[in-house]
């Protein structure tokens, strides 16, 4: 049986972590490499870096962060933000990223997913989906894709889009509920399960974690294969080990370091 993954996420701007981190053993809470080393030592299964500056002028800074993290850490790294071309993916992988996350560029040019998967293998291509619940014209609701940090509505159905990008070669979906992100009310379980049940690749649930039970819920009821969280770990509310122990007690298969 697959092991459930617990994945902390770091938002990076101009080479610095922009959301506060409260690890007591960090010398510099704004240094993403130090934060990554702490998460690696704590037993995180993977780490997600999101370059929220996401401009080519800042790419060199992020590449240095990825390179230094890869040299210091054993856990796999997923890096996203501003990835628009095959060359962007190439330099991130060469710098030490294990997987690269594509978001807005995949929405505007679907064939980019296919090109990336064919060149680098689907195992390292993650498509990030930011979805929000919207009203249908004739009544009812659906989940719609938003891009550019949630500012731009696309009118694209999230479930249909997930199926399409997987058919083009996406090896994993990073699914964020914009309705739940930052609320600490738990994952959007109907959204997560709808996407996870519609594709044959792993789905990472993201957005809304406030308790350890929320992590369990994302796997058990959301049918995700991994859970991503930020603030509950960054602010020292829970440790990675506490999260994993809680999930083990709930009957989920976890990788536990000795």
UniProtKB/Swiss-Prot annotation:
One MF annotation (Gene Ontology) recorded for this entry: lyase activity
Claim: Transcription is one of the keywords in the record: no
Gene Ontology biological-process annotations: L-histidine biosynthetic process
One annotated Gene Ontology cellular component of this protein: cytoplasm
Gene3D superfamilies given in the database record: Aldolase class I
Family annotation (InterPro entries): Aldolase_TIM, His_biosynth, HisF, IGPS_HisA/HisF, RibuloseP-bd_barrel
Catalytic residues identified in the record: 11, 130
Assigned keywords, A-Z: Amino-acid biosynthesis, Cytoplasm, Histidine biosynthesis, Lyase
Function: IGPS catalyzes the conversion of PRFAR and glutamine to IGP, AICAR and glutamate. The HisF subunit catalyzes the cyclization activity that produces IGP and AICAR from PRFAR using the ammonia provided by the HisH subunit.
HAMAP family: HisF
Record-given protein name: Imidazole glycerol phosphate synthase subunit HisF
Provenance organism: Rhodopseudomonas palustris (strain BisB18)
